[in-house]
Amino acid sequence: LLDCMPALHDDSFENAMKVRYDLYETAHILFRTSYHKQVSDWCREHHLQYATEVPSMRHSTQRYSDIVGGDTAHEKLGKPLEWIYDEYIHNYRSNAKAVSSLARQLGKKYAMIESFHSVGWTMTLQDAKWMIDRLGSSGINLYNFHAFYYTIQDITKHDAPPSQFLQNPYWKYYRKLADYVGRMGVMVTNTDADIQIAVLDPVAALWTKLGNPLHGFPYRGESEREQKK
């Protein structure tokens, strides 16, 4: 292992691309087998479904999940679609379309997104519907809203707001949103996707360039020359 360490700093090192790939692949397999598979097996043994919304090394990190998930939709109404894609599409966790695609590939019924955290206390039901519509059009059919706080005392008030619970001025209207979201989920679940285009996931190439998969593949090496490339 020590003999291969220079490959992480010098892309001209012998077999540097393979060494880098093997490093990320090893971390990915260890994470998936030592954590996800064990939790998934325990859930199955106890008749529970294993739902995950986790950082992923690659698309197949959630292979052992019964419900695959992601974390996106954290903005006020009006952001251009181009901004949404630029902000979220490069990260497995925040790419709603990648989540629904993975669910389809694995034959899973549900694709889940956790949404609404950190939008702020100015978030309205109109903002919520706008984000839900976008998730539904991306194939998401299970919606996990962040969060329903039992209290907003002290620092809790500032922990990735808003609360969707009693403290929210829109709470008395929440049934309308809940009914709408329920209908959206049923519709998407019972809709067949007409997929005509396949997009190659370039994760292998990004790994060889030391792209960090947990944070949208930014370069994580120390070579200024390679970073410019």
Model-found features: residue ranges?
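Carbohydrate-binding surfaces of carbohydrate-active enzymes
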Residues: L1-K229
